[in-house]
């Protein structure tokens, strides 16, 4: 009988515990491997330096201030459970819930056309406005300490993680959001990792290029190389307790936006009243039981949808190699044949993207 796991952290630990021979082999590499590792060390150090240059971190919120904001986050969760938010405000997944305010955007299975760069903002009014407490308790403090300018934020997302949850390697869509990307952490300490590779079945996460501890009440600002040229993620082993992060961003004025007629949902908030509104705005729930291998995955791997945004169309006869999609866009000039663009009967090129769904 196969073992069962409550979350991904246990499964990651079991992989190393159950495979001592493999561990010993890694501890005793061949001379060729040692030479390759020695040669790559300067490159890794240089990349880590570039990542570090694009990160600003400051501790702004005291424990008392954190507790007050965390109570407000709990209120958001409660309102979502009661179905008091608009349909596209809440996005649920096992071990991770997202709450979009101000601006929301499509991704994964929500996309009409799958692939990098296909994300679209929802029409205005499709998600709820940024709560007053976010402006008063969070954004105002950031403006006062000159972390962001006045009027910068028009999109606020609350990611609420349970122990063992995570988000795979990704780059925030450059065609949707301006830089910097600002996040504020609550409930517990965690870490942000850069340049990790996620592998599934079995679940594995590679060592990061750069590991950034993130404390409760701290503000993390990403720009430059850290925001655009390398992926970031939250690993399951780094979420030991419940953790929430408030992500504050500004959408680009030229960011593509869905038209009302293209939405999968046909409801219009201004026409809803009384029981009709309550009926349509019910909480969104996953219809699939939590799976240790898939619990933390969004509808499409963000590493696929974000990092391949710079991919080029390849001839039909070229096939995808064994290279991982992780970090593909950063080295596309070296491995241009790692992805194949194959058409249907008409032979037209179509971007091939690895899909994973709930």
Swiss-Prot record:
**Which segments show compositional bias classed as Polar residues?**
262-278
Q: Write one Pfam family the protein is assigned to.
A: 2OG-FeII_Oxy_2
Keywords, comma-separated and alphabetical: Dioxygenase, Disulfide bond, Iron, Metal-binding, Nucleus, Oxidoreductase
Where does the record place Basic residues bias?
A: 279-288
Entry keyword Transport = no
Necessary cofactors: Fe(2+)
Q: Cystine bridges: which residues? A: 196-233
The UniProt note on the cofactor reads as follows: Binds 1 Fe(2+) ion per subunit.
Its localization reads: Nucleus speckle
Report the GO molecular function annotations. Answer: 2-oxoglutarate-dependent dioxygenase activity; metal ion binding; molecular condensate scaffold activity; mRNA N6-methyladenosine dioxygenase activity
Q: Where is this region: Disordered?
A: 1-50, 259-312, 334-358
Catalytic residues in the record: 105
Q: Which reaction does it catalyse?
A: an N(6)-methyladenosine in mRNA + 2-oxoglutarate + O2 = an adenosine in mRNA + formaldehyde + succinate + CO2
Give the compositionally biased regions (Acidic residues).
32-46
Entry GO terms, CC: nuclear speck; nucleus; paraspeckles
Q: Which domain of life is it from?
A: Eukaryota
Q: Which InterPro entries match?
A: AlkB-like, AlkB-like_sf, ALKBH5
Q: What is its EC number?
A: 1.14.11.53
| Role summary | Dioxygenase that specifically demethylates N(6)-methyladenosine (m6A) RNA, the most prevalent internal modification of messenger RNA (mRNA) in higher eukaryotes. Demethylates RNA by oxidative demethylation, which requires molecular oxygen, alpha-ketoglutarate and iron. Demethylation of m6A mRNA affects mRNA processing, translation and export.
What PANTHER family does the entry give? Answer: RNA DEMETHYLASE ALKBH5
Domains as described in the record: The C-terminal disordered region undergoes liquid-liquid phase separation (LLPS) for the formation of paraspeckle membraneless compartment.
Q: What is this protein called?
A: RNA demethylase ALKBH5
């Amino acid at each position: 009988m196969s073992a069962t796991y409550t979350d991904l952290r246990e499964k990651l630990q079991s992989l190393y515990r159950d495979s001592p021979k493999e561990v010993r082999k890694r501890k005793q590499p061949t001379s060729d491997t040692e030479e390759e590792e020695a040669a790559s060390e300067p490159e890794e150090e240089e990349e880590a330096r570039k990542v570090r240059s694009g990160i600003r971190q400051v501790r702004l919120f005291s424990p008392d201030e954190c507790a007050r904001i965390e109570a407000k986050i709990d209120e958001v969760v409660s309102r979502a459970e009661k179905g008091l938010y608009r349909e596209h405000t809440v996005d649920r997944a096992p071990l991770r819930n997202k709450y979009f305010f101000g601006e929301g955007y499509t991704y994964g299975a929500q996309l009409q056309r799958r692939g990098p760069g296909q994300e679209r903002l929802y029409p205005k009014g499709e998600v709820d406005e940024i709560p007053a407490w976010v402006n008063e308790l969070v954004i105002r403090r950031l403006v006062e300490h000159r972390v962001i300018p006045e009027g910068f934020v028009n999109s606020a997302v609350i990611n609420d993680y349970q122990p063992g949850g995570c988000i795979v390697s990704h780059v925030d869509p450059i065609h949707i959001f301006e830089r910097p990307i600002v996040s504020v952490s609550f409930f517990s300490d965690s870490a942000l990792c850069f340049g990790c590779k996620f592998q599934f079945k079995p679940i594995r996460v590679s060592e990061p290029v750069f590991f950034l501890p993130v404390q409760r009440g701290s503000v993390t600002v990403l720009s430059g190389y850290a925001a655009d040229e390398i992926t970031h993620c939250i690993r399951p082993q780094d979420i030991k307790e419940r953790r929430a992060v408030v992500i504050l961003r500004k959408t680009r004025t030229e960011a593509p936006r869905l038209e009302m007629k293209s939405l999968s949902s046909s409801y219009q908030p201004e026409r809803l009243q009384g029981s009709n509104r309550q009926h349509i705005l019910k909480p969104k729930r996953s219809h699939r039981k939590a799976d240790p291998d898939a619990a933390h995955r969004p509808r499409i791997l963000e590493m696929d949808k974000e990092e391949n945004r710079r991919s080029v169309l390849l001839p039909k006869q070229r096939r995808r190699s064994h290279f991982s999609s992780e970090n593909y866009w950063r080295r596309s000039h070296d491995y241009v044949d790692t992805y194949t663009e194959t058409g249907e009967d008409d032979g037209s090129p179509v971007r091939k993207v690895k899909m994973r769904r709930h």
